[in-house]
């Protein structure tokens, strides 16, 4: 069974604690050594997902995390409860910062990712240069929120993205 790992600092730094699938209110997190409002990044392997909540008792603002999240945006250092759930293992598309599958890489499962969500998972705006879809269909959008504009569909390894190289602001991944 896979666990998530929560970190006190962005980019997976600082104190870290593994959490197995379960529900964690503030008192349970504190019993595990996780102080309130200290989580800044989360590693989420295939087979689990996490829902992070601003308030105790699974209330308030929330974000669902389905892959490694280098930063948590508005919930950075602002998480008081967490649900960790087992989910079916899915293939993940792999995105690279450089052509020829080089440089920083980030894996994402099927889903829709706006620019804000891509940044949560470590993909800065306009930085993708090559893609391995791993059996999935990846659609790259030049504009955020999947809005009109240039797109590129990728169903096989793409060592270069042509006009979409370093020009992607949102992504849709489907089986």
Swiss-Prot record:
The gene is ops. Residues 2-46, 48-86, 91-135, 136-175 form the Beta/gamma crystallin 'Greek key' domain. It holds the Pfam family Crystall. It is found in: Spore, Perispore. Belongs to the beta/gamma-crystallin family. The keyword Repeat applies. Residues 87-90 are annotated as: Connecting peptide. Keywords: Repeat, Sporulation. GO terms for biological process: sporulation resulting in formation of a cellular spore. SMART domains: XTALbg (SM00247). This is Development-specific protein S homolog. Has a two-domain beta-structure, folded into four very similar Greek key motifs. It comes from Myxococcus xanthus.
């Amino acid at each position: 069974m896979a666990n998530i790992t929560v970190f006190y600092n962005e980019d997976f730094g600082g104190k870290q604690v593994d959490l197995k699938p379960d529900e964690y209110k503030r008192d349970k997190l504190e019993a595990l050594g996780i102080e309130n409002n200290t989580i800044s990044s989360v590693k989420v392997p295939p087979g689990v997902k996490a829902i992070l909540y601003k308030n105790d008792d699974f209330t308030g603002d929330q974000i669902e995390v389905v892959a490694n999240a280098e930063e948590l945006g508005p919930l950075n250092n602002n998480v008081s409860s967490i649900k960790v759930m087992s989910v079916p293992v899915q293939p993940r598309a792999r995105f690279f910062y450089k052509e020829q599958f080089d440089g920083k890489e980030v894996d994402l499962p099927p889903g829709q990712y706006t620019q804000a969500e891509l940044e949560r998972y470590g993909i800065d705006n306009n930085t993708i240069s090559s893609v391995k879809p791993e059996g999935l269909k990846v659609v790259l959008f030049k504009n955020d929120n999947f809005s009109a504009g240039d797109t590129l569909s990728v169903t096989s390894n793409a060592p270069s993205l042509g006009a979409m190289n370093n020009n992607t602001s949102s992504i849709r991944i489907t089986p």
